[in-house]
């Protein structure tokens, strides 16, 4: 199986009869893989949360919009994109998360915004997000030591979330994709990769 942990597309919004152009080779390869019997599991991220049924119907992807714990090779694996984890103390992120995941907003957006304008806005918004995290990603190039923005080791929100979750759930591995740079953090039995 292949697991895609979100933000595969810079911005993805599905209208009833329109999908973003520019991803035809990626979509074709994913469809080819699923046609050959390869299971492709796609966990949506904050850049592609508005996935509808197109990728499942046309490309054969298995779509997940929320975290899942799966048993893979005998190990319990927690898989999520990670964009909406550990946001309780961040009211603006919590608000934006609620707005962007709103079915009402999605419906209004699909009926009220022309696809050209929607994609232009989506790419602009995505670019703002990337610029905001670009320096952090560049400074945090170590695979084993996450960039934390502070001198405290291992205080990334996703690592903190994994610590808290593993106190009450038996999980062998946490897999995230939200930070857009590789991580391999181990603390005793806790193992988090990004």
For the regions a language model picked out, list residue spans one by one.
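Conserved beta-sheet core of the metallophosphoesterase superfamily
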Residues: 58-66, 76-78, 83, 87-95, ...
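Core catalytic region of metal-dependent phosphoesterases/phosphodiesterases
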Residues: 1-72
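Active-site-proximal loop/helix segment associated with metal-binding centers of metalloenzymes
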Residues: 80-157
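Short, charged/polar low-complexity linear motifs in solvent-exposed/disordered segments
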Residues: 29-30, 60, 75, 95-97, ...
